[in-house]
């Protein structure tokens, strides 16, 4: 057996101990976790010992420590301090206390004045300062140890502006809580100059939660589009007060800038019809996010709200979610910087933390998908640059997502998954509406019944049937109320106030105006109209004219004055042509002594007077002793006889009608006739669309008519159509009213008639308050009724009456050129033909005479023409063949003639 020396044993034992200690140190070193402290500074809250942000801060640190996924070798601890609100001195003191303990980052506080004090210290000592609420940021902040997880309000302001543009608002009221609200909404406040937007800015009361005086002013000013910049707690109180004041109706639309709108209890408002829109940054569609929020709710870490606060219990607010994400973002930077250690820092020594700059850079470079979506920062100013907002809106099921917004793509409105409209008031189903109307036959009238009737059953008429059809299509119920002052609606020239149904729509006393309410420009400026359900125009209602007996000279009436003038001209023309042709035609000259065929004298009976006599005899159908002999003159005579036959026959036929019927003569035939006289008074319904038309018209005729009506306002303007109709029946009065009503009245009163055509063109529409969500639905329903033909059927039902007997025309129309102008053409053609025939006869006879007299054709023609043109002579010598005699006989003949001719001596 070998013996080991004691010295060697001690050496081996010593080495074994060293190896064991080294192994133990290595094992200890590998199993040791790094401890890192975060600091949190939070304000005291009234609801409990800890606010939502502090609870979320602790909840996030504990979650990271439990999971060990993000920081497997690091254990986080925290130091939280409480300060009073707005106490920046205390905030600075607490920050210095935490820095002396050694913290890697400071979270909070939330209020801007306290946060600025803490940030100043963190900048000096190089410690990251993490914010989760909005704080006004200076433009140059590149060296700041600061990041904010709250979305930049310049982006939020653009999101709100995009919503305003999407809803097509023209007027907006901005209500803010404190002065920082004006800074946050700078993009919106600058919008009026660029987007033609009228902006009104109001501030909530500072020392009280009572917003009723402000809401009362807004209600009086009819401010229906409102943007509230306030906390969700204050928003809940405002909604409760608005409900009590009747401002939670479909005409109001509220946009809230708070990202905690989903935390409000909206159960009392679901069926009110109010439009409520806001944004949400919590990514609730992510399953991991939903599980964390559910765990938060189950652990009930947050103190429950007060019973009357209007807030939901168990919801993680946006501030809490942002604080939860802030802790995780800083932890991501810690994971990337394992060699980082914290050290105690003293505020009075101004010695910065040596790892601060690197750690701050890692925080700004960090990326994290948290409860509030993607988180990235601007490396220069530390602001959050990438985020998504859900657009949420109140529906009957509660607040639902209707779209998204992000800084890059802007607003993207999406349809509801259930296929429901984005706005709650787009649906009229099961809604109860107040309908204002006016008694106007046949549109609205009391139903005749032996039993007493109540409610809507009291009324019937065209508009009542229309309202019933609209109710069936859209599914709403209604209550009919007669307008209090019995007027349609007109604006007072002095104070600009409206009356009638228009006023009730402006004041939201009624939801619809279903009546014969004309769509006009001035009304469209204060209320909205649907598409017209009836098209019409202004016309004149007047008594039917009395009949008059034929006058002394009524025998002239069968032919128009133009025809009488043309007949006279035709008579003169035919007579002259007959005279000329008769003298021109050789065959119209005859031997006046038939017993002496050797006579060289011929005669022409168609002198100028005889030609006129021939025409008169034919025209009077009496004939004359003159008979044309030549073909040309016979053509003239025949055409003239044919002409007189047609004229006399037409005259005789039309004369019977003129002498046997009464003539209906109206003193006016158009609006121009009314304007040119003052004997017949005329007017319209006071404060109606017809009166407004004449009042606003720039056309000279209508302006003159309005001057007449306004000068006799008390006597010519009536209160209703019924009064105007009675005045027409009982006095010399013309009533200006809508053509459809005139059509209805004249069907039932045969003593009335419409004078002239339409003065203008317009339509009746269903009136709604300005900006009403019901208008488009009403319009679509009206178009549907029009396509189905139901509007026409309803009009036939109410306009068709017993009717007046069909009246035959009580005044025959005088025959004009368009009736018998053709006979003048035939007459002219006959005259032209006769001229050509006469020329032919003349040439033919001249040729024969030239051959007979052994002379040239031209000389014979000239001689014949010379004799024909001597209009004063009825006789001329007949041409004879030349006779050859001896000279002595000629001398003897001249001697004989000289003895018989008188004046021989004078001539010699």
UniProtKB/Swiss-Prot annotation:
Modification after translation (UniProt): Sumoylation mediates kainate receptor-mediated endocytosis and regulates synaptic transmission. Sumoylation is enhanced by PIAS3 and desumoylated by SENP1.
Disulphide-bridged cysteine pairs: 96-347, 750-804
Extracellular compartment spans: 32-561, 660-819
Pfam families found in the cross-reference section: ANF_receptor (PF01094), Lig_chan (PF00060), Lig_chan-Glu_bd (PF10613)
SMART domains cross-referenced by the UniProt entry: Lig_chan-Glu_bd, PBPe
Gene Ontology biological process terms from the UniProt entry: behavioral fear response; chemical synaptic transmission; detection of cold stimulus involved in thermoception; excitatory postsynaptic potential; inhibitory postsynaptic potential; intracellular calcium ion homeostasis; modulation of chemical synaptic transmission; modulation of excitatory postsynaptic potential
Modified residues (Phosphoserine): 846, 868
Binding site for L-glutamate: 516, 518, 523, 689-690, 738
Single annotated GO MF: kainate selective glutamate receptor activity
Membrane-crossing segments per the record: 562-582, 639-659, 820-840
Regulation: Cold receptor activity activated by temperatures between 10-19 degrees Celsius.
Compartments, record wording: Cell membrane; Postsynaptic cell membrane
Glycyl lysine isopeptide (Lys-Gly) (interchain with G-Cter in SUMO1) crosslink location in chain: 886
Reaction(s) catalysed by this chain's protein: Ca(2+)(in) = Ca(2+)(out); Na(+)(in) = Na(+)(out)
Tissue: Highest expression is found in the olfactory lobe, piriform cortex, dentate gyrus, hippocampus, granular cell layer of the cerebellum, and in caudate-putamen.
Glycan-bearing residues: 67, 73, 275, 378, 412, 423, 430, 546, 751
Cytoplasmic topology ranges: 583-638, 841-908
Membrane topology, as annotated: Multi-pass membrane protein
Gene Ontology annotations for the cellular component aspect, listed alphabetically: axon; dendrite; dendrite cytoplasm; glutamatergic synapse; hippocampal mossy fiber to CA3 synapse; ionotropic glutamate receptor complex; kainate selective glutamate receptor complex; membrane
Annotated CDD domains: PBP1_iGluR_Kainate
Signal peptide positions on this chain: 1-31
Function: Ionotropic glutamate receptor that functions as a cation-permeable ligand-gated ion channel, gated by L-glutamate and the glutamatergic agonist kainic acid. L-glutamate acts as an excitatory neurotransmitter at many synapses in the central nervous system. Binding of the excitatory neurotransmitter L-glutamate induces a conformation change, leading to the opening of the cation channel, and thereby converts the chemical signal to an electrical impulse. The receptor then desensitizes rapidly and enters a transient inactive state, characterized by the presence of bound agonist.
Assembly and oligomerization: Homotetramer and heterotetramer with GRIK5. Tetramers may be formed by the dimerization of dimers. Assembles into a kainate-gated homomeric channel that does not bind AMPA. Can form functional heteromeric receptors with GRIK4 and GRIK5. Can form functional heteromeric receptors with GRIK3. Interacts with DLG4. Interacts with NETO2. Interacts (via C-terminus) with KLHL17 (via kelch repeats); the interaction targets GRIK2 for degradation via ubiquitin-proteasome pathway.
UniProt xrefs under PANTHER family: IONOTROPIC GLUTAMATE RECEPTOR
The protein's name in its UniProt record: Glutamate receptor ionotropic, kainate 2
Protein species of origin: Rattus norvegicus (Rat)
Gene field: Grik2
């Amino acid at each position: 057996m070998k013996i080991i020396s004691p010295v060697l044993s001690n050496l081996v034992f010593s080495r074994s101990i060293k190896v064991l200690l080294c192994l133990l140190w290595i094992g200890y070193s590998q199993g040791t976790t790094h401890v890192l402290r975060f600091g949190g500074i939070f304000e005291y809250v009234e609801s409990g010992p800890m606010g939502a942000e502090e609870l979320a801060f602790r909840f996030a640190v504990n979650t990271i420590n439990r999971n060990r996924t993000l920081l497997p070798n690091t254990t986080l601890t925290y130091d939280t301090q409480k300060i009073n609100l707005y106490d920046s001195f205390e905030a600075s003191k607490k920050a210095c206390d935490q820095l002396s303990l050694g913290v890697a980052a400071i979270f909070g506080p939330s209020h801007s004045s306290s946060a600025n004090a803490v940030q100043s210290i963190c900048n000096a000592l190089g410690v990251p300062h993490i914010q989760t609420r909005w704080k006004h940021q200076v433009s140059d902040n590149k060296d700041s140890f600061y990041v904010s997880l709250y979305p930049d309000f310049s982006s939020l302001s653009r999101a709100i502006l995009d919503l305003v543009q999407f809803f097509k608002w023209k007027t907006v009221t901005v209500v803010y809580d404190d002065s920082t609200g004006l800074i946050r909404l700078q993009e919106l406040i600058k919008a009026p100059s660029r987007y033609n937007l009228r902006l009104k800015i109001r501030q909530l009361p500072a020392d009280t939660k009572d917003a009723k005086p402000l809401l009362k002013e807004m209600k009086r000013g009819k401010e229906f589009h409102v943007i509230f910049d306030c906390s969700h707690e204050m928003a809940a109180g405002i909604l409760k007060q608005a409900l009590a004041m009747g401002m939670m109706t479909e005409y109001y639309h509220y946009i809230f800038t708070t990202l905690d709108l989903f935390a409000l209890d909206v159960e009392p408002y679901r069926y009110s019809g109010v439009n409520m829109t806001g944004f949400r940054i919590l990514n609730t569609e992510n399953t991991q996010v939903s599980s964390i929020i559910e765990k938060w709710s189950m652990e009930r870490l947050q103190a429950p709200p007060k019973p009357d606060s209007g807030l939901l219990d168990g919801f993680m607010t946006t501030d809490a979610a942002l604080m939860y994400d802030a802790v995780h973002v800083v932890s991501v930077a810690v994971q990337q910087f394992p060699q980082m250690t914290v050290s105690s820092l003293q505020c009075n020594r101004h010695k910065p933390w040596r790892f601060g700059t690197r750690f701050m850079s890692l925080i700004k470079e960090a990326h994290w998908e948290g409860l509030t979506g993607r988180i990235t920062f601007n490396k220069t100013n530390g602001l959050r640059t990438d985020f998504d907002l859900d657009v949420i809106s109140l529906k009957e099921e509660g607040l639902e997502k209707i779209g998204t917004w992000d800084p890059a793509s802007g607003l993207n409105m999406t349809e509801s998954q259930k296929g429901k409209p984005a706005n709650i008031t787009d649906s009229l189903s099961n809604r109860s509406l107040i309908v204002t109307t006016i008694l106007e036959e046949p549109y609205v009238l009391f139903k005749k019944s032996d039993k007493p009737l109540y409610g809507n059953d009291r009324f019937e008429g065209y508009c009542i049937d229309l309202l019933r059809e609209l109710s069936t299509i859209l599914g709403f119920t209604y209550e009919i109320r007669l307008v209090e002052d019995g007027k349609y609606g007109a604006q007072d020239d002095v104070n600009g106030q409206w009356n009638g149904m228009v006023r009730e729509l402006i004041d939201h006393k009624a939801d619809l105006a279903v009546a014969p309410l004309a769509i006009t420009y001035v009304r469209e400026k204060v209320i909205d109209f649907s598409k017209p359900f009836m098209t019409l125009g202004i016309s004149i209602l007047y008594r039917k004219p009395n009949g008059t007996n034929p006058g002394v000279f009524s025998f002239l009436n069968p032919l128009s004055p133009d025809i009488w003038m043309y007949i006279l001209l035709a008579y003169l023309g035919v007579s002259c042509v007959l005279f000329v042709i008769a003298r021109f035609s050789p065959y119209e000259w005859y031997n006046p002594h038939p017993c002496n065929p050797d006579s060289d004298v011929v005669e022409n009976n168609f002198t100028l007077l005889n030609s006129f006599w021939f025409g008169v005899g034919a025209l009077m159908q009496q004939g004359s002793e003159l008979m044309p002999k030549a073909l040309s003159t016979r053509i003239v005579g025949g055409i003239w006889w044919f002409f007189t036959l047609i004229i006399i026959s037409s005259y005789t036929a039309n004369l019977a009608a003129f002498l046997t019927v009464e003539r209906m003569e109206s003193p006016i035939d158009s609006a121009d006739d009314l304007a040119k006289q003052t004997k017949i008074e005329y007017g319209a319904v006071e404060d109606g669309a017809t009166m407004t038309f004449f009042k606003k018209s720039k056309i000279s005729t209508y302006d003159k008519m309005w001057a007449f009506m306004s000068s006799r306002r008390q006597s010519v303007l009536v209160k209703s159509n019924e009064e105007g109709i009675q005045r027409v029946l009982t006095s010399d009065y013309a009533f200006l009213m809508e053509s459809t009503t005139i059509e209805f009245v004249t069907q039932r009163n045969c003593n009335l008639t419409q004078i002239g055509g339409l003065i203008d063109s317009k339509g009746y529409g269903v009136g709604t308050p300005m900006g009403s969500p019901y208008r488009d639905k009403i319009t679509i329903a009206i178009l549907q009724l029009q396509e189905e033909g139901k509007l026409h059927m309803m009009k036939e039902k109410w306009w068709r009456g017993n009717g007046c007997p069909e009246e035959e025309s009580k005044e025959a129309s005088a025959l004009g050129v368009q009736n018998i102008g053709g006979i003048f053409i035939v007459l002219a053609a006959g005259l032209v033909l006769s001229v050509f025939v006469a020329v032919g006869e003349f040439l033919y006879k001249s040729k024969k005479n030239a051959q007979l007299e052994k002379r040239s054709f031209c000389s014979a023609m000239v001689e014949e023409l010379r004799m024909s043109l001597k209009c004063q002579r009825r006789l001329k010598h007949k041409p004879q063949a030349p006779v050859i005699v001896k000279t002595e006989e000629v001398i003897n003949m001249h001697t004989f003639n000289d003895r018989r001719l008188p004046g021989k001596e004078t001539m010699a």
